[in-house]
Swiss-Prot record:
One of its GO terms (biological process) is viral budding via host ESCRT complex. A motif (Nuclear export signal) lies at residues 16-22. Residues 105-128, 434-486 are annotated as: Disordered. Residues 8-43 are annotated as: Interaction with host CALM1. Residues 275-361 are annotated as: Dimerization/Multimerization of capsid protein p24. Residues 12-19 are annotated as: Interaction with host AP3D1. The modification Phosphoserine is found at residue 146. The modification Asymmetric dimethylarginine is found at residue 406. HIV-1 lineages are divided in three main groups, M (for Major), O (for Outlier), and N (for New, or Non-M, Non-O). The vast majority of strains found worldwide belong to the group M. Group O seems to be endemic to and largely confined to Cameroon and neighboring countries in West Central Africa, where these viruses represent a small minority of HIV-1 strains. The group N is represented by a limited number of isolates from Cameroonian persons. The group M is further subdivided in 9 clades or subtypes (A to D, F to H, J and K). Residues 7-31 are annotated as: Interaction with Gp41. This is Gag polyprotein. Belongs to the primate lentivirus group gag polyprotein family.
């Protein structure tokens, strides 16, 4: 069908275009807003033809109003547009959108008051405080709990097996019930007899505590008065249905049904704790677990904790952040202690996914690279050596970048025919002496040792056999003169090692 702009014509269209979008604003409603509303209704699976009449607009308002608190801005804008259009159809004079919303609220309040008055008149005729109702004769009679309620209760116990949500379900189904009705609900539970025995023990303990705090008055009961209920009467074991109704509807009333229900809920809390053995301290977020799933497990376990609301609030503020994984914990601590649960879940959305892992890895690699660069820079700190050109002899550039005419020959000695790396010009060695030396030997060689020469043939002695003593392996002892001569041969090492203490 497409979007339509023919919803309003004539006077209604003029009135529509005079209404401002905001109080004190300059912009007014136009035909394009009706076209947009048509398209948005199709998105919400609503019939756009409902905009043609005031009754249709009222139906749209009833459909959209429950979702306003959790809806998007588009939903709120659509609701405001339909509310304004409803006022135009009803010919209600308004100046802006806020006045239209106020008119809608006034009509809804008036309709609600009429409904309450009609309901109160009907209740005054036939019933008071279900399941105890008043019959036509004005007597208070009991309506048994329905089979549908019992079936819902049994189904919850079988499916949930005393999980934390069983307690609110029991509270809702047992609203206004008598002790007899409550016993009927407990007796319909076929399985979990160990849990039911624990519940009976808790009820007996509470009944004994009631008897201790409310002792029996001495003497007979005055005529026309009801006796005070005992613990067993509240539990429905020693009292009749008529007595229970009389206590609950008396003046002053004794709410035996509510008291008994409170005892049962206390026992159910113990059973829920037994069926949920996991402590709130053990609920920790896994390394790859989404934060939303972790929050669900946390509050499900917190629901089973036997603690006051203040303690549970402290657990939520402290343990929820403390037991999160390192990635979420870093984000939550950055939000601060006053962050709401919605802000936490929004901030941690996507943590643990591929995109988040890639971002974390990139940040880690960036930090490693920065650290490496800083270490490399720190290793080469110190005064910089000035570079010198071998061609022109000036500092600040190298020979390959020199603009001066290239010097011919060796850059060291100035002679042609060889390069500087092959230059044989004398240069100082590590002892500070010029090398090559004209004397032949460097300073760290023996200088005064005579060169060995062969004697003339005329002076050569005839070879004779050595004496027998020379074959003995004896240690030769040098003479003092020979030792002094050897020491004098080492005098040239003074330049290297200083004074020789052996000569002193």
């Amino acid at each position: 069908m497409g979007a339509r702009a023919s919803i309003l014509r004539g006077e209604k269209l003029d009135a529509w275009e005079k209404i401002k979008l905001r109080p004190g604003g300059k912009k007014h409603y136009m035909l394009k807003h009706l076209v947009w509303a048509n398209r948005e209704l199709e998105k919400f699976a609503l019939n756009p033809d409902l905009l043609d009449t005031s009754a249709g607009c009222k139906q749209i308002i009833k459909q959209l109003q429950p979702a306003l608190q959790t809806g998007t801005e588009e939903l709120k804008s659509l609701f405001n547009t339909v509310a304004t259009l409803y006022c135009v159809h009803q010919k209600i004079e308004i100046k802006d959108t806020k006045e239209a919303l106020d008119k809608i609220e006034e009509e809804q309040n008036e309709s609600q008051q009429k409904t309450q008055q009609a309901g109160a008149a009907d209740r005054g005729k036939d019933s008071q405080n279900y399941p105890i109702v008043q019959n036509m004769q004005g007597q208070m009679v009991h309506q048994p709990i329905s089979a549908r309620t019992l079936n819902a209760w049994v189904k919850v116990v079988e499916e949930k097996a005393f999980s934390p949500e069983v307690i609110p379900m029991f509270t809702a189904l047992s609203e206004g019930a008598t002790p007899q009705d409550l016993n009927t609900m407990l007796n319909t539970v076929g399985g979990h007899q160990a849990a039911m025995q624990m519940l009976k023990d808790t009820i007996n303990e509470e009944a004994a505590e009631w008897d201790r705090l409310h002792p029996v008055h001495a003497g007979p009961v005055a005529p026309g008065q009801m006796r005070d209920p005992r613990g067993s009467d509240i539990a429905g074991t020693t009292s009749t249905l008529q007595e229970q109704i009389a206590w609950m509807t008396g003046n002053p009333p004794v709410p035996v049904g509510d008291i008994y229900k409170r005892w049962i809920i206390l026992g159910l809390n113990k059973i829920v704790r037994m069926y949920s053995p996991v402590s709130i301290l053990d609920i920790k977020q896994g390394p790859k677990e989404p934060f939303r799933d972790y929050v669900d497990r946390f509050f499900k376990t917190l629901r089973a904790e036997q603690a006051t609301q203040d303690v549970k609030n402290w657990m939520t503020d402290t343990l929820l952040v403390q037991n999160a994984n390192p990635d979420c914990k870093t984000i939550l601590r950055a939000l601060g202690p006053g962050a709401s649960l919605e802000e936490m879940m929004t901030a941690c959305q996507g943590v643990g996914g591929p995109a988040h892992k890639a971002r974390v890895l990139a940040e880690a690699m960036s930090q490693v690279n920065n650290t490496t660069i800083m270490m490399q820079k720190s290793n080469f700190k110190g005064p910089k050596r000035a570079i010198k050109c071998f061609n022109c002899g000036k500092e600040g550039h190298l020979a390959r970048n020199c603009r001066a005419p290239r010097k011919k020959g060796c850059w060291k000695c100035g002679k042609e025919g060889h390069q500087m790396k092959d230059c044989t010009e004398r240069q100082a060695n590590f002892l500070g002496r010029l090398w090559p030396s004209n004397k032949g030997r460097p300073g760290n060689f023996l200088q005064s040792r005579p060169e060995p020469t062969a004697p003339p043939e005329s002076l050569r002695p005839e070879p004779t056999a050595p004496p027998p003593e020379s074959f003995r392996f004896e240690e030769a002892t040098p003479s003092p003169k020979q030792e002094l001569k050897d020491r004098e041969a080492l005098t040239s090492l003074k330049s290297l090692f200083g004074n020789d203490h052996l000569l002193q």
